[in-house]
Amino acid sequence: MKKEKPSILLSNDDGVEAKGLNELIRGLRGMGEIIVMAPDGPRSGASGAITSEHPVKYYKVREEEDLTVYKCTGTPVDCVKLALHTVVPRRPDVVIGGINHGDNSSVNVHYSGTMGVVIEGCLKGISSIGYSLCNHFADADFSSSLPYIRRITEQVLEHGLPLGICLNVNFPDTASLKGVRICRQTNGAWINEWKRSLHPRGGEYFWLTGEFDNYEPEAEDSDHWALGHGYVAVTPTQIDVTAYGMMNELKNWNLEV
């Protein structure tokens, strides 16, 4: 009996026309049956947002051999939910978000719509991977990341991932990658996040900006260190965010009324 091709579901938060998504498609062609359900425009920073206040629609963009592309009016997470409910003929073997224009290392994982895609796939019990490049520009060069994306995806298809675990993969913006480092999430936070301006007609407005404050710049096991030294940063990420080490401490607090 002929072996079934892997089923691969893709989405992103930069929109269906983003170069990163289309480079991801190019890099994965031939690996299986690819279905894309991506937002119809940029949804960066959408995290795990879902749409509940109005209907969501989707439209077919193009269809080729082993590739069908749809665009969706909702969020990145809406895209995954809707694709699984409508256009995916069988359970995907892998859900992939990316390639994101901009890294999703450290605390960015909490804001990222690309990682929202990945976490939604993970919540559904599907092996899921997020790919991001440390370059926000629309014409970013993704070419050096594609061989690694293909290899990592092959390995996930071969081995699978444990329930509740996904991969957050970030690439430095360099043509000369030094290899792969298995990393943990860097401890840090965004500071000076708003730029204030005065409107010519009166009043003020703000643009979100900011600087990343790395609490541990010398931590060689962290994703920021790996990226800063030319390595691909692979961070296994879990959806259970329970702080188990704090549970016994809290039992000693006087929380009853």
Where are these predicted regions, by residue range?
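Hydrophobic/aromatic ligand-binding patch that stacks against planar heteroaromatic rings
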Residues: 117-121
